[in-house]
Amino acid sequence: MLLEARTYALYLAIATKIGHANAQTGPVPVVGMTAGIDQVTGKLPLRMNIETLEQEGGPMWDLLIRGLDALQNKPEDDQRSHFAIAGIHGMPYAPYNGVGPVPGGSGGGYCPHQSPQLIPWHRAFLALYEQTLGDEAQRLALEYTDNDASAYREASQKLRLPYWDWASDPTLPPSTTQENITVNGPEGEINLHNPLYSYRWQTYPLNETQFPGHGEIGPETTRQGGGNDMTKFIKDSVYRTFSSTTTWDEMASMAGSGSSFESPHNAIHNSVGGSFLSLDLTSFDTLFMLHHCNLDRLSAIWTASHHDTLQVQPFTSQGLYSTAKGEIITADSPLKPFYQADGRTFHTGRTVATTEAFGYTYPDILGGDQGRKEVIAQINRLYRGLSTTEDWAAASTSRREWFVEIEVDRADLPLPCNIDVYLGDRFAGRTSLLSMPKTGIAYDELSLSRAVKSLDVHDNEPGGTERRLMNDLHVRVTKGGTTLDPRDIPSLHINVVGEEVTPPSSESEFPSYSNRTTATVIYVPTLHVARADTDD
């Protein structure tokens, strides 16, 4: 619904007042980190796994922690502070780079979710944070002298944000769970509040004008746990997206049918809980940067294995802070509020299509001479778990695999929430929906393979396995500690899908899928009744 003119005028006045300090200094162009790139070979510095970076320690680790600490302690009205950059995502709904709200906007943050812009928008967002962190690291490196000087200067040039590979292990990295941390300063060890653990609000209690409805939260960002109970389901979801999607639009967003990286990304948000549950607050937790670096990484690996970098189909926006509801989004639509180097032209999906645009890469995609086959082999090693000849031989027989398709209108749900799928009492997978957008059809696809295996289903009668699955399948829709009856959600549609899966002939190939069948689940009181259809 479009904002009424009077409401919009009042909202604009409040937002302009809040964002006035930021607007005074002029736009901050998003160029990423330009330092540390080999001027001869063009080799790019790596965004590293946070656990690898911590284990290696040394100057880069020291500068990461000290740099993040410096950003968190910058004044809130500094455009280059942690507070100001994190605030672009959700609250305090204030203009950044002078880019204000528009009539027909959502009244929320700038960030798109359930949209093909999800990944490119966050790529620009992370690049802004990374270049600001790099500036702090290079400043801090100058404090080190004597034998340490050159090592810290070199590390400051190559420092990039690390990622948390929740697709391999969704438990919180150890370095993010300790409240205090010790690193090496120019004159010895320094004990700090760990910036990877939480962000402490400088103004507390929170300003109700900036954070309406959040005045009662604690003095720092919080978490409730991690995804340690979802390791296999998340890995399956990620691998299914790598191996079955063929276009950017499918891979990037839950706005279309099939699996996507947005789904496990959402599951991590909801499982971590605390501040991570709220799209208004989540980006203030530095863990958010690590989380989204991994989403960016997965998309970059997908691009390297599929040679596809751009949104294909136009998408109708549900409305954002500076984007009107109904606006048609393409790969050339602006990623507000992120300007290119000229400070006047917005980035688009096209200008941020590669990691090279912002001066970094990932260990999984080392360069142009690394072919698609090597990237696929790495995907298979990391996420399918088949890394030896014996493993591949054991998986060489074609078989029928089973999936659940989920479709639901977000407007029918109390967001954020989870839709958990079970076979009998065996957890099979989860579709997680975040608090925004409030409307729009969400799609997901979850693997039933592990749950089917645990049920020891070996029914050779035609259609027998499918009927067994339909009888045993049920879902739970939960928000916090409350469970909803699926029959009270009229738009919720559940399909059981079967596909013939032919394993790859080598580790450098994906499996192929064929002979797809679909059975629609209809909820009648406590029974599950199926009507079987076959897709063309």
Language model features: what each stretch is:
Residues N22-D536:
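C-terminal accessory segments of proteins
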Residues M1-V30:
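Fungal secretory targeting signals
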